[in-house]
């Protein structure tokens, strides 16, 4: 998890999945409240995945003196297609019943970025903000706390979109996107390395938005790393192998740092490529299972291909289970799930 003060508002960036995550959220809010000098009791959850852990944390905080406001765009668009989506719908209903008008859950189609769900400074007096630990969570939290710039909403939508479009926003947005692209992947032998690097990136970017020259210089150093990663991606793209009709796999195990957005874009230049797969030894699933397979549906096929169809309908999105998937066009699995479920399904 990452913690920052954004315009004096304590902010926690976290993806809640476990009981430990619930405790971390509740403890963070309680600690923030103990240092809070205002009279408000509001805690904002924004761009937070609608998981069982998220609901549990909100239930605990609501049972205390806190007024919880929930804003998010991870709702299910239409009828649930599988058990995972069914659980999201059930959790959504729980939150709506618990929070009433303080709960606003929409879908990405209507709100590509969560920053569009708040006005500038709407929660500048909040006790705390809890957000997803990605660029969309950061931009939404900073806007809620009172820091913004003219292109923020458009930039946020790109930052939360496909990797290849994340670097196409304003110059300040590109500094964040390229910095995110070259963060060290999660390594179980150095479990804090990625988190600490991301915390420094977020802190520098917030300063850069306000014009801090030293922070901008540090971000531009990350851009040099990004440029090298792009070159590596170009080399890796030439090693792609079709493992099923329209499915191209690239093995990046023990390879230098690469940019996923560039790699995907190069692979998708082939009109027959429906799904890209990256095999890697780092990431939240790899940290537990050793190897991780990351699948992404090519943009032109996203209305036709649902990756949730490749795993059992009752599959749980959890690194321990070897599956992570919050949207239909992205799926991360362990080697066991890939070999025994996903690859056979792709080959039909």
PLM features per residue range, with description:
Residues 190-193, 198-207, 212:
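Eukaryote-biased recognition of electropositive, low-complexity segments
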């Amino acid at each position: 998890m990452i913690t920052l003060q954004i315009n004096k508002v304590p902010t926690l960036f976290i993806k809640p999945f476990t009981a430990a995550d619930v405790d971390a959220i509740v403890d963070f809010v309680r600690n923030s409240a103990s240092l809070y000098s205002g009279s408000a009791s509001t805690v904002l959850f924004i761009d937070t995945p609608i998981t069982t852990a998220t609901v549990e944390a909100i239930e605990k905080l609501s049972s205390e003196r806190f007024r919880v406001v929930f804003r998010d765009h991870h709702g299910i668009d239409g009828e649930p297609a599988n058990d995972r989506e069914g659980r999201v719908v059930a959790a959504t209903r729980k939150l709506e019943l618990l929070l009433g008008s303080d709960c606003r859950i929409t879908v990405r189609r209507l709100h590509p970025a969560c920053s569009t769900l708040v006005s500038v400074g709407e929660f500048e007096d909040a006790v705390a903000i809890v957000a997803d630990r990605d660029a969309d969570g950061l931009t939404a939290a900073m806007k809620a706390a009172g820091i913004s710039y003219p292109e923020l909403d458009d930039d946020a939508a790109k930052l939360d979109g496909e990797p290849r479009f994340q670097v196409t926003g304003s110059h300040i947005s590109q500094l964040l996107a390229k910095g995110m692209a070259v963060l060290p992947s999660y390594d179980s032998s150095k479990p804090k390395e990625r988190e600490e690097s991301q915390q420094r990136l977020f802190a520098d970017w917030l300063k850069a938005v306000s014009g801090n020259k030293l922070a901008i210089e540090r971000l531009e150093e990350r851009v040099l790393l990004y440029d090298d990663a792009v070159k590596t991606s170009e080399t890796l793209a030439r090693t792609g192998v079709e493992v099923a009709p329209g499915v191209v796999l690239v093995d990046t195990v023990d390879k230098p740092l690469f940019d996923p957005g560039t790699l995907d874009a190069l692979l998708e230049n082939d009109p027959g490529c429906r799904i890209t797969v990256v095999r890697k030894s780092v990431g939240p699933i790899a940290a537990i299972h050793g190897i991780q397979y990351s699948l992404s549906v090519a943009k032109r096929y996203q209305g036709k291909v649902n990756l949730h169809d490749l795993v059992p309908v009752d599959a749980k999105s959890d690194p321990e289970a070897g599956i992570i998937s919050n949207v239909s066009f992205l799926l991360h699995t362990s080697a066991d799930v890939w070999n025994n479920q996903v690859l056979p399904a792709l080959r039909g």
